[in-house]
Design a protein with these regions (language model features):
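Conserved, structured core segments of small domains
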Residues: 1-129
Length: 129
C-alpha cells in the first residue's frame, strides 16, 4: 500500500531540524527499500525548509502511521502536524529511477540542502572523497 506523508515544520524549528539531520537520515535509511520519493518542501525563497514529503510503500495503515509518527523530527517537535494519506503511483516510477536526484552515499541520505548547511557532513556525491 502506498502512502503520502507530509510533515509540516513548526515556525522557528530550522535549528532543531539541522541538529537532528543525522538521526533523520538514519531513520530514513531503514525505509530505503520502501521509499518511492522524498524531499523537503521549501519557502518562496527556494532555500528555507517548511516541511518534508515522503511517499512510501508499506504493508498497511498501521505501518504508515508508525513511519510518520516515529520519525525523529516529529518526536522532537520539529513538525507542527502530519498529513498521511493513501497514494497511488500511477506513473510506476520512483526516485531510484533518477539517481542524480536522490543521492545515497555510504548508507547516509544526503540532500543539497543538508550539504549546504553542514560543511563537515559525511554527505558527498557518489565517486568523490
Amino acid at each position: 500500500m502506498e502512502f503520502f506523508c507530509y510533515h509540516r515544520d513548526r515556525r522557528g524549528s530550522v535549528a532543531l531540524r539541522d541538529e537532528l539531520l543525522e538521526e533523520h537520515w538514519s531513520y530514513m535509511d531503514r525505509y530505503a527499500a520502501e521509499m518511492i520519493a522524498r524531499g523537503p518542501t521549501l519557502a518562496d525563497d527556494g532555500d528555507t525548509p517548511t516541511g518534508s514529503v515522503h511517499i512510501v510503500d508499506l504493508p498497511d495503515p498501521a505501518a504508515a502511521r508508525a513511519f510518520a509518527f516515529d520519525e525523529p523530527n516529529y518526536q522532537a517537535g520539529v513538525y507542527r502536524d502530519v498529513l498521511l494519506r493513501r497514494w497511488r503511483n500511477t506513473l510506476g516510477r520512483t526516485m531510484w529511477d533518477f539517481p542524480e536526484a536522490a543521492p545515497v552515499v555510504t548508507g547516509t541520505w544526503c540532500s543539497a540542502w543538508a550539504r549546504a548547511r553542514l560543511p563537515t557532513s559525511p554527505c558527498r556525491p557518489t565517486g568523490t572523497s
